[in-house]
Amino acid sequence: MKKLALLLAALGVVSAAAYAAPELTVTSVGQEIEIENQDHYENDLDDVWLFNNVGLAYGDWSFGLQAGKQWGVNFDDDNNKDKGVASEDSRLQIDVWKKVTDDLKLGFRYRGHKNYDRYYARWDYSHGMFWSSGDVWYEATNGSGLTKMTDKVDWVKSEFFPIGLKYGAFKVGYFIDYRKTVGTDDVNQANEYFEHQIRAYATLYKGERLTLTTEGRFTISQEEEFNGSEPATYRHYDDLGRNRIYLGADYKVSENLNVYGKYGYEFRDWKLEGKNAEDHTQNAYQDFVIGWKYTF
């Protein structure tokens, strides 16, 4: 009887372990610095971000938490800005993903900034050589509207790939950026935006520790619509006038620790409308990222 009782107890422990509820676990931690800059714009370094990232998992659910701080940097007294470093913005971001099928994930994201809050619906689909992904979000502004129109109207925005193809180390997708204001717009202010791109990705080298990648973003066309008539002076990207190239590197320091970086440069060709004089501001864009990630 004692042996039978021990056997039944052992079977009970095994059964409980087999059907135990999933646990919330930390899957990764990391930090990232991103520097975004447009030539001849507000600051010498427009946006300098420090991000702290945490990844979690619970069964088929995955979560991401991000807290960030942004500064503007000026090396001299120019552009109506004082020399030095100024705190300008912050970010709190929460990501939730649910694996629906082997091919499809659905997600939600909240992103909060000083002047706006965003609420995203997301998807990520991949089957064979076909893929699709995207974000659609509502942007609720918190600003006063004293500086620009975008500070006082809400938006519905989207960035998505309706269709993409992949083969081996190469991937290409058709990308759409669409935005529409919600509520009352000022006369002659932009209230709708449409941009079409082709984006391509490739792994250039993959070794035991080092991986090198590249990404290209090529704008086909970009259009804006206005509330009422077009303003007397404005500009937009010319057809094929916005093209960005990234080079990235990821190095595996250990089984769990990776360090990575990437650099992007965007070439811009503006089309001037109306009586707009030659404008050389924001004629190029640069993006630099460096970070580390520890996976458990």
Residue ranges and their predicted role:
Residues 19-80, 287, 293:
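Short glycine/proline- and aromatic-enriched beta-strand/turn motifs that initiate or cap beta-hairpins
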Residues 52-58, 94-98, 121-127, 158-167, ...:
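Residues on the lipid-exposed face of transmembrane beta-strands in outer-membrane beta-barrel proteins
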Residues 251, 265, 280-296:
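Outer-membrane beta-barrel "beta-signal"
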Residues 1-20:
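Gram-negative bacterial Sec-dependent N-terminal signal peptides
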